[in-house]
Amino acid sequence: MSLSVTEGYIAFSHVLTEDQYQGQDVGYNVTLCMDTEEAAKLSALDVIVKDYQGVAQRKFKSGYSIDVLDDNGQAMSMTEELPRGTKVRVQWKHGNIHPQHGLATYANRIKVLEMGTGDIPLAFENAEETTDF
C-alpha cells in the first residue's frame, strides 16, 4: 500500500456525514483546492487534477468516516464539517488507475493546519482584475 500526502484548502468537506448524489449516500470525501506545485506532484503520479476557475482541485474519497487530526496530531472532536478554506494535509492511499479518472485517491486521514473562515485563498490569485466587482 502506497501512501502520499497532499496539502491544500478545503473546498468541500464530507468527513462527518456521507455525501449525497441523487438522494443516495455516496461515501465520505474531501475536495481540495491546491497550488500549482501540489497539482504537479499529483499529475506526476497520474492523478487527474481538475481546474475550477483557474484553481486546481482534486477529490479524495473514503468508504468510511475520515479521521481528522489537529496540528499536533491529536484526534479532533468535531460537531460540524470542516469549513471552506481550512488549510489541511490529506494522507491518502493510491488506488487503481482508471483510464478516464486517473489514479484513484482514497483519503486515509486529514491533518488541520489552519481553520478556514469560508474563503479559499487560492480562489482569486489567478483572476483578472476588474473594476466591475
Task: Label each residue range with its predicted role.
Residues 1-59:
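OB-fold ssDNA-binding interfaces and closely related basic DNA-contact patches used
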Residues 1-3, 116-133:
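Acidic, gly/ser/pro-rich intrinsically disordered tails
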Residues 28-30, 90, 108:
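Hydrophobic residues positioned within well-ordered beta-strands of beta-sheet architectures
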Residues 34-36, 94-96, 114:
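Beta-strand elements of well-folded, non-transmembrane domains
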Residues 41-45, 102-103, 122:
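A short secondary-structure junction signal
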Residues 50-74:
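Extended, solvent-exposed segments with strong compositional bias
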Residues 72-88, 94-104:
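Exposed beta-sheet edge/beta-hairpin loop segments within beta-rich domains
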Residues 98-118:
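OB-fold/S1-family single-stranded nucleic acid-binding modules
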